[in-house]
């Protein structure tokens, strides 16, 4: 009782998330919310029907700790079907409360205090918090846009980030918030360094089915590279692929000893999750290829719609190769700071975005960049673009 702030020191840098702040702004001002990455449509009807059936037929109690067998089998089948990866559903897959818990449980399971985690910035903000909760230290490697607008890391900077306390590399591809899809050469360098330094990899691949047809490279799971399956925990979720972000159903796949470690931690975080929703996600994972390609094509059209509208409104646009998000530079509109720009945007034109600098340790690298989500209905995007054009008019 000797301090006025009861929060532990390692968590004091983390306030209310930018998503909560900007979503509250949207509600308060009636703005179009393009800040947070959630769709405004529901997922495939087969999945919704399966969830309703599960609710009606007694799937409302605790599911098994690792997840129901049907979902674990569906995850294994999905990874075999799309990526040629073989996982034993009875020991190499665990179901989690979304990818956020999967990342947190993986880091908590593998990192001792003082261990170092290499991550690529800008990064999803929960990564930094999960690393801090473990008492570990993050070592960011900055992705920078080239002349073509595509982000990339400096291989020398990545090599320099490895050291005697490096425990794991946290890799997100397709990448939030930049929309970057890591190339085979980039992944090969990551894999070589992981093997050389004998470290683990945790890969967040929730946008695995949102790689657009004009991307410079297809999505390649790091676990498919030589020597990486045995040291990689691969994470994905239903939220982004099936437009059900509120369900919070994710999974971790990997070698049995690593997955067992994650499960040991997960059981003391949420214990189990989403009993009646797990059978529905199992159904969704078995949908035909046409669902996955159609979903991608639909989201790509929305990307094109919003990117063109942002350019017309006067932003500098860094077109993404995947994900839900497009990065925009506020400099052409006279902006100097993304946080200030985003806080004023709802009043100026009735649209909400999020400042990208909050995803960086190197704040200057993202100071003039902001992120918009395009996973919204076309008419919502059209209204947002109409409002954003007021910025240029003014």
Give the positions of each predicted feature.
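N-terminal small-domain helix-loop-helix segment of the aminotransferase-like
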Residues: 2-98, 105, 157, 284-287, ...
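Conserved glycine-rich beta-strand-loop-beta hairpin in the small C-terminal domain of fold type I
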Residues: 282, 298-307, 317-330
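Active-site phosphate-binding strand-loop segment of PLP-dependent enzymes
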Residues: 139, 143-217
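PLP-dependent enzyme catalytic core of the Aspartate aminotransferase-like
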Residues: 159-160, 344-353, 359-394
């Amino acid at each position: 009782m000797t301090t006025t702030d009861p929060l532990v020191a390692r968590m004091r840098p983390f306030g209310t998330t930018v998503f909560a702040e900007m979503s509250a702004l949207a509600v308060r001002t009636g703005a179009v919310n393009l800040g947070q990455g959630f769709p405004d449509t529901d997922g495939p009807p087969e999945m919704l029907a399966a969830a309703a059936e599960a609710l009606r037929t007694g799937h409302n109690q605790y599911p098994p700790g690792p997840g129901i067998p049907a979902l674990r089998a569906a995850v294994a089948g999905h990874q075999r079907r799309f990526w040629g990866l073989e996982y034993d559903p009875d020991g190499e897959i665990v179901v989690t409360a979304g990818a956020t818990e999967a990342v947190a449980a993986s880091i908590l399971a593998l990192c001792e205090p003082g261990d170092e985690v290499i991550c690529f910035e800008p990064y999803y903000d929960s990564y930094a918090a999960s690393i801090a909760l473990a008492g570990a230290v993050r070592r960011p490697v900055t992705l920078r846009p080239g002349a073509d607008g595509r982000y990339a890391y400096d291989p020398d900077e990545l090599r320099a980030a490895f050291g005697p306390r490096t425990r794991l590399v946290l890799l997100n591809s397709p990448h939030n918030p930049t929309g970057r899809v890591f190339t085979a050469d980039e992944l090969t360098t990551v894999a070589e360094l992981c093997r050389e330094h004998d470290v683990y990899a945790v890969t967040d691949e929730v946008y695995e089915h949102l790689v657009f047809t004009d991307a410079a490279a297809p999505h390649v799971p790091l676990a498919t590279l030589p020597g990486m399956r045995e040291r990689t925990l691969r994470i994905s979720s239903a939220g982004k692929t099936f437009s059900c972000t509120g369900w919070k159903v994710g999974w971790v796949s990997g070698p049995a000893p690593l997955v067992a470690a994650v499960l040991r931690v997960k059981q003391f975080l949420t214990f189990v999750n989403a009993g009646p929703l797990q059978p529905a996600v199992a159904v969704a994972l078995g949908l035909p290829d046409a669902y996955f390609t159609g979903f991608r094509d639909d989201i790509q059209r929305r990307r094109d719609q919003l990117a063109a509208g942002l350019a017309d409104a006067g932003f500098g646009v860094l077109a993404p190769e995947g994900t839900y998000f497009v990065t925009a530079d506020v400099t052409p509109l006279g902006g100097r700071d993304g946080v200030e720009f985003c806080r004023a945007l709802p009043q100026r034109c009735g649209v909400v975005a999020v400042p990208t600098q909050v995803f960086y340790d190197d704040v200057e690298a993202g100071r003039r960049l902001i992120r918009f989500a395009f996973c919204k209905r076309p008419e919502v995007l059209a209204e947002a673009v109409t409002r954003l054009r007021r910025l240029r008019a003014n």
